[in-house]
Amino acid sequence: MGIISTILGVIGFGFGTTIGIVIGYYLFIYFQSTDVEDPEIKPLVELDSETIATMFPEIPMWVKNPDFDRIDWLNKLIGHMWPYMDKAICKMAKSIAKPIIAEQIPNYKIDSVEFEMLTLGSLPPSFQGMKVYATDDKEIIMELSVKWAGNPNIIVVAKAFGLKATVQVIDLQVYATPRITLKPLVPSFPCFANIFVSLMDKPQVDFGLKLLGADVMAIPGLYRFVQEIIKDQVANMYLWPKTLNVQIMDPSKAMKKPVGLLSVKVIKAIKLKKKDLLGGSDPYVKLTLSGDKVPGKKTVVKHSNLNPEWNEEFDLVVKEPESQELQLIVYDWEQVGKHDKIGMNVIQLKDLTPEEPKLMTLELLKSMEPKEPVSEKSRGQLVVEVEYKPFKDDDIPENIDDPNAVEKAPEGTPSTGGLLVVIVHEAEDLEGKYHTNPSVRLLFRGEERKTKRVKKNREPRWDEDFQFPLDEPPINDKLHVEVISSSSRLIHPKETLGYVVINLGDVVSNRRINDKYHLIDSKNGRIQIELQWRNSS
């Protein structure tokens, strides 16, 4: 009887429990407490200040800040690409972490550390808004608001002394506002040399951590402690103005930084060809480096002389010694009309031995075309001395990667002086009365320089630089900048689109100024000029 009673008691308990669960389930579904109400949905403008303050952290940046733009298109793009980005990012993370782990584990007597599982989950990050800053420098600055409530699964297995331990990271949430700067902008794909990343605020990080299957973050006080440690460590490394620098390409090669100086001494010419009707010539020599935007340099004119002697020295900045060549052209000066070319020749810089002067006597040719027939009559000879002086490592600025860095003046500049560099970048909103084919004319201490002409353009870009070696700083000098439009028409062939006069005293004290100047005598025209003062020491 005792056994039968026990069996009946167990059956009754099981039956009663089952009936109770079923009845409770239906009561929970079909009956609702009277104090439970549906949430009330209101427009944001109707909410009181206290409610808005509570919701404020969740409001997107483009709502709180008018200068932030919505970038839903980017979120859609990343949403479609996320399954592939997840695999690519995890693969790259493993390849980066593997050698670092292999280098560190011997110090802790650990046999191995491996990823048993590494996935970022199915939920992509969300960009709440983006702000782009406009600057006059060659850079792009962006600020992003990033939120990521992901479902990653990262399992790391460590083995030591025959034991195995697993660490699992789950339910990762990150909120950060990074500033991304792309600079300097260069004319080679992807069109920027470096990526600089800074955090504008301390990031908010939340995650779950399991050790041997147990939730470590459930330990009282540990959760808050770990959060603060992570915030402080990340802030110490990347909180603005500190940056993470990722180099995409060598900026010195992309921007073709100067690597040396070519010293040329034009000594004399011998038995030049007669160009004038009276049996003479008025020769001068023009020197240029191939692939250089800087205008060529010229000797003085020697009137009525077929065997002129100049003994003039010139310094040319070299950027690509393996491919550049020095072009020497002898012209016959004419008071009216185009100057006649007497002859020319070139010197390949790769054929020169650095730091070794070389005296050369060049035969003047009609042109450097290989199919050009040899002239029956000699055009004369040109005697020059050339020396290539590569810059030493000490002469290269430490911050050469910085596009705003100012170099020193070339060797040979007077100790009390330096080099004034004027870079004409661009102009905007130019208005010509008859035509708009702008070029820029610079006038400094009686010396005139000009940029190339841009046809039919109200927003021209030149990016041409001009150098003025000076014996003393231009503290009290002024630079006259004039924008001119020229045309081949007989009527109104030239007109001024505006001008500006720049005091150079600030350039000497600041070493670099890059600004946009409003043009005088122009309604809305502006021109961007960059000025650099490079001391000789």
Swiss-Prot record:
Zinc is among the record's keywords: no
GO BP annotations listed: lipid transport; protein secretion
Location within or outside the cell: Golgi apparatus membrane
Domain C2: 240-362, 402-517
Xref: SUPFAM superfamilies: C2 domain (Calcium/lipid-binding domain, CaLB) (SSF49562)
Residues in compartment: Lumenal: 24-537
Keyword terms, alphabetized: Calcium, Golgi apparatus, Lipid transport, Lipid-binding, Membrane, Metal-binding, Repeat, Transmembrane, Transmembrane helix, Transport
Record domain SMP-LTD: where: 67-249
Record has Transport as a keyword: yes
Pfam family, one: SMP_LBD
Chain segments annotated as transmembrane: 3-23
Binding residues annotated for Ca(2+), in chain numbering: 276, 282, 332, 334
Membrane topology field: Single-pass membrane protein
GO cellular component, one term: Golgi apparatus
Annotated region described as Phospholipid binding, given as residue ranges: 227-505
Biological role: May play an important role in regulating an unconventional protein trafficking from the cytosol to the extracellular matrix.
Family according to the record: Belongs to the synaptotagmin family.
Protein name: Synaptotagmin-2
Organism listed in the record: Arabidopsis thaliana
